[in-house]
Amino acid sequence: FKEELESTYENVSCVLTSKNLGMGAGNNIGIKKAKTDFVLILNPDVVLEESTINELIVASRKITNFAILAPISTDTNHPNYRLLKNKKTWTKDETLFKVKSVDGFAMLFNKKKLDKVITNNYFDENFFMYLENDDLCERIRKINEDIFIVSNSKIKHLGGKGVNEKLKDKIELSRNWHWIWSKFYFNQKHYGYSKAFLE
C-alpha cells in the first residue's frame, strides 16, 4: 500500500504505524513530519466540495493571526463548532467568525505559529478517541490564540457510515467506553476532579 501510494503520487509520503494509536497520537506523527507552514487534518469520512480547500487557503491569506481554521459542516442540525460565550449565533454574511472550538474531522493548523507556542504534542495522547480536539482548542484559547470557522468553505461529515454491521455492537460499546473516559479526563484536566466526578 505505502509503496503503491508513494510511487503513484510523487508529493505524498505515507506513514504506517504498527498499531492503532488513536486519532490524536496518529495525527501527531503526521504533524511532526510536516515541514509546511500549514497542516490540514482531514478524516476519511468527509465529503469536500470543489472549493472547500481553496476557501480555507483564501481565508488563511486574509487573516494571518489564526491558530486554526475550519470549514463549516453542511449539516446544520449538527454544527461542527461551539460559539464563544459572547456570541449567540452567526449570520450568513459572516465568512469568518471566531469560535470556542471546532470538531476534529477537518482543521487547518497554522503550524508556523503553533510550533512556537505548543511545546509538546498538538493532541494530548491520553485521549484515544473523543474530545482530543476540544482539549487542543481549550489549550489554544488559554494562550490567547484564535480559532475561526470559514463559512464559505463547506464540508459534509458522514460520521462512520462504513461500519461493518456484524461489528456494530462491539464498536458501539468501545465508543461508549472511550467517550466516558475522555469526558472524565477532559474535565479533570481543565476543571479539576470535582467537576470530572460530577459530570
Describe every region a protein language model picked out:
Residues 138, 142-199:
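Active-site-adjacent helix/loop segment of glycosyltransferases
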Residues 43-47:
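The conserved acidic donor/metal-binding loop of glycosyltransferases
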Residues 82-108, 112:
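Short, flexible, basic/aromatic active-site loop/helix in glycosyltransferases
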Residues 50-81:
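Conserved donor NDP-sugar-binding/catalytic core segment of glycosyltransferases
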Residues 16-34:
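Glycine-rich, basic loop-to-helix element that forms the pyrophosphate-binding segment
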Residues 39:
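Short aromatic/hydrophobic "clamp" motif used to bind/position activated sugar donors
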Residues 106-154:
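A short, conserved alpha-helix in the catalytic core of glycosyltransferases
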Residues 1-16:
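Acidic donor-binding segment of Leloir-type glycosyltransferases
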